[in-house]
UniProtKB/Swiss-Prot annotation:
Protein name, as recorded: Homeobox-leucine zipper protein HDG11
Disordered as annotated region, ranges: 1-42
Principal localisation: nucleus
Pfam families cross-referenced by the UniProt entry: Homeodomain, START
Biased amino acid composition, Gly residues: 1-19
Gene of this entry: HDG11
Amino acid sequence: MSFVVGVGGSGSGSGGDGGGSHHHDGSETDRKKKRYHRHTAQQIQRLESSFKECPHPDEKQRNQLSRELGLAPRQIKFWFQNRRTQLKAQHERADNSALKAENDKIRCENIAIREALKHAICPNCGGPPVSEDPYFDEQKLRIENAHLREELERMSTIASKYMGRPISQLSTLHPMHISPLDLSMTSLTGCGPFGHGPSLDFDLLPGSSMAVGPNNNLQSQPNLAISDMDKPIMTGIALTAMEELLRLLQTNEPLWTRTDGCRDILNLGSYENVFPRSSNRGKNQNFRVEASRSSGIVFMNAMALVDMFMDCVKWTELFPSIIAASKTLAVISSGMGGTHEGALHLLYEEMEVLSPLVATREFCELRYCQQTEQGSWIVVNVSYDLPQFVSHSQSYRFPSGCLIQDMPNGYSKVTWVEHIETEEKELVHELYREIIHRGIAFGADRWVTTLQRMCERFASLSVPASSSRDLGGVILSPEGKRSMMRLAQRMISNYCLSVSRSNNTRSTVVSELNEVGIRVTAHKSPEPNGTVLCAATTFWLPNSPQNVFNFLKDERTRPQWDVLSNGNAVQEVAHISNGSHPGNCISVLRGSNATHSNNMLILQESSTDSSGAFVVYSPVDLAALNIAMSGEDPSYIPLLSSGFTISPDGNGSNSEQGGASTSSGRASASGSLITVGFQIMVSNLPTAKLNMESVETVNNLIGTTVHQIKTALSGPTASTTA
């Protein structure tokens, strides 16, 4: 076979040296003057043999071939690019044919199974098949379970009168092994609906039903069918985006300007000159552009990172504080040779800042993965205009993503570019205006920092749980440590969804931001089963994020802010380190004055990095905790996550200017933004309806907590602006 190659090097692709942009920017006269020729049979034969040995030759190999064959190095480079593209197309056609045949086979089997189900009969009772709508059956079973619990409580009360002692109720959890915690742990007193404190199980008012809001039209859909006409268009958009991202990753000035001594900000004027656009994207005066670049070293190899980036479930777990929702809508290409090289996915994604004051950003985008050279991968995201996509936020993602380069000892260097155009339909709250307008809240540095912290967390799994930093050797096995970390990860994800303004959480806004900035939502939870209220607010403190983090994570200072502890001391009885910073850990806490009649403990994870910190906790039953510590699946352990996220307020650069007062009542000196979120079980009845008394109670709870934190950290004269 032969390829037509221009003498001027204007073949397909641009290797990051600007060849592709010259091809597009050249005038009609220049294109007519370019001369083309075909390679000789001997040249092609030599190139083919070299391609079989190494499809990705380096510069030294390309120069050697250039001397042997009498061709320019650029011609060698473009020949290999074209050959790889042709080989990829051949593999894709073969894969598509095989997938189509397999799809036809599965479709026939599906039809046969559906027909068989229509005539299915239960072998035990001879009855008809199950209902086609399991929702009502599930609700009926939950109501029956609630009645059975009431009957059990009534019978236990009657039996206790005759036996002269209380009868312990049956545990709803599976049998478990005895843990060392059994001998050392009691529980917190006065922990609300989990102990003997004030209950939120009120008489529910009729007519105040809580309807679950529908998800986004794309988020709730199954995989979309992409036509054969659209696939080449998507592939072309992805390849163009990859070329642009490579230029942005590899070029410094004048495209990028260094600010704050460490952040790279895109020079929009230079960008428009290098990447002129025929559309109005990036030119609308009503839109604001945020573009930044950052890099860092992470403790994970490139292939493992690529695997996580191309899996939406793992992607969401990797960035729980940034990604509110992520779903693969269609797989246009699954990659080559069992890897993600050439993989192209169509995604729905929603980005968040952990605060009820900041709206989320929704994107329908293409994610493309390509190996640039041995040990180096590029993952690019770019918005795609899909007719079915109706966005609540007018946001567009220009070519963004990262370059991942393998380094020795299992490390990788990650260089990240984030380039977003957004329209602010509502005025950004003054607390977050600075960090959002400066591109910090959704910027590249936050992505890299979060990735570094999460990779460090994953790496801690290889550290034995009985290290000197663990207390008492409670976590005895690697399986137990892994199970505890999975439980804590689910707790964090649950908390992040409860405090953000995601459009895709299955919840109802009960009370929008009131006069003190508290937002209350309600949803039906499977674990624990029932109706859950979520309340969240954000407030400012003049203290540094690290000081606030140290105060909130320390069990010795917990009674100063934890309303539900009733001022009782708390002690740490188990500890798992999951990072180099001493504050990055998972803890199990108990009340020092608790009695053995209440077996409720507190599971807590704290984490800090340069972008911020969080302290998240949840009451957990002792029996359930034993399940996790024995290494069993913790997926069904009930969790009601509460906690705090702490981030810089973005005014660090102003701290030397005297801290002039602003209209919000807070000084412009560096401080912290704290988001506090509580989740409380209102009722264990699946058909429960909500009353306003429970909303008022949770508002009072969160308001009291905020006041006590401000009093403890800022003193009586501190700012009270929320």
